[in-house]
Amino acid sequence: MGLQKSHLTVCLPPSVPFLILVSTLATAKSVTNSTLNGTDVVLGSVPVIIARTDHIIVKEGSSALINCSAYGFPDLEFKWYNSVGKLLKEMDDEKEKGGGKWQMLDGGLLNITKVSFSDRGKYTCVASNIYGTINNTVTLRVIFTSGDMGVYYMVVCLVAFTIVMILNITRLCMMSSHLKKTEKAINEFFRTEGAEKLQKAFEIAKRIPIITSAKTLELAKVTQFKTMEFARYIEELARSVPLPPLIMNCRTIMEEIMEVVGLEEQGQNFVRHTPEGQEAPDRDEVYTIPNSLKRSESPTADSDASSLHEQPQQIAIKVSVHPQSKRDHVDDQEGGHFEVKDEEETEPSEEHSPETAEPSTDITTTELTSEETSPVEAPERGLPPAHLETTEPAVTCDRNTCIIYESHV
């Protein structure tokens, strides 16, 4: 009995490990099946863009390589389109010859050989598989490097520069010639015609004063000086602007100056006022200024006040009536005419000044401007001829009366 029990205990243990091994194998199989099923889901994916390129710049005549930069599983199928939407294909005969202009490489690469300026534009890559489709666009820019155009532009610039330089040199030469001619003409004008006109103006300026007193002589000198200064200014102005038409302008200006200076004024008549208590005869009511006291009759005249825009001068004329004694009357008849000294000296004005003059019956003062005068008809009887060559103060002698004119500015 004891031997049989020991044998049974030995035979039972081998069955337990077998069961454990079978169960382990079954578990491993199930785990393997589940793992394989999960792997099948992970391996499939839609296409994605892994890098984007905006544009590519290449020189004309070189090659351009454009990458689609797309990834997906299973493998993607790539197609390229140009800017007008045309599908780019590589012909079979071109493949046999080593490839044409458009070469489709693995991984979605497009190789453009011998790029021309007309190849510029946008290129679109379309990548697709069983899970989806995606596209990527790249712009191709071509640099134009033709040597003929560069030479053409250079030649055009050189020709334009040469023309401009020739025109500038010609203009400078013409200006220089005009300057010389203008200077010569101006010098000739002021040596001949201009000098004569200026000399006439100076002579007329010396005869500007119509009365002889210290103040009038000073006014004449000032006016003469201003006339000379104005003439010099005109000459300097003519020399400062070197243009040929200036010669005519200068002559016109000088002629206008002479015309302004040569304004002729009609005779000025003054009415004598009879002193109180005396009655003057009708024939002596009006006195006329002698021709010697009038302004010059020169065609160039004797005043430049209008050209200098000076204020009008006030002239006060004093008329004194003195009765003449019989003795003086006899002397006057024997002598014939009065002798009048030169008015440029100050002695006559001192002799007939109001301070040293004898008291007269009445003195009437009339103020007249050099521009506004009231002409009065002259009587039939004028002054003696001897007074036509005299200057202020003017002396008029009647039968029994001596009238002295004194003028002051």
Swiss-Prot record:
S-S pairs: 68-125
Q: Which GO terms describe its cellular component?
A: cell junction; cytoplasm; nucleoplasm; nucleus; plasma membrane
- SUPFAM superfamilies, alphabetized: Immunoglobulin
**Signal sequence interval, chain numbering:** 1-28
| Listed InterPro entries | Ig-like_dom (IPR007110), Ig-like_dom_sf (IPR036179), Ig-like_fold (IPR013783), Ig_I-set (IPR013098), Ig_sub (IPR003599), Ig_sub2 (IPR003598)
Glyco sites are at 33, 37, 67, 111, 135
Extracellular topological intervals: 29-148
Give its localization.
Answer: Cell membrane; Nucleus; Cytoplasm
Stated name of the protein? Microfibrillar-associated protein 3-like
User: What's the source species for this entry?
Assistant: Mus musculus
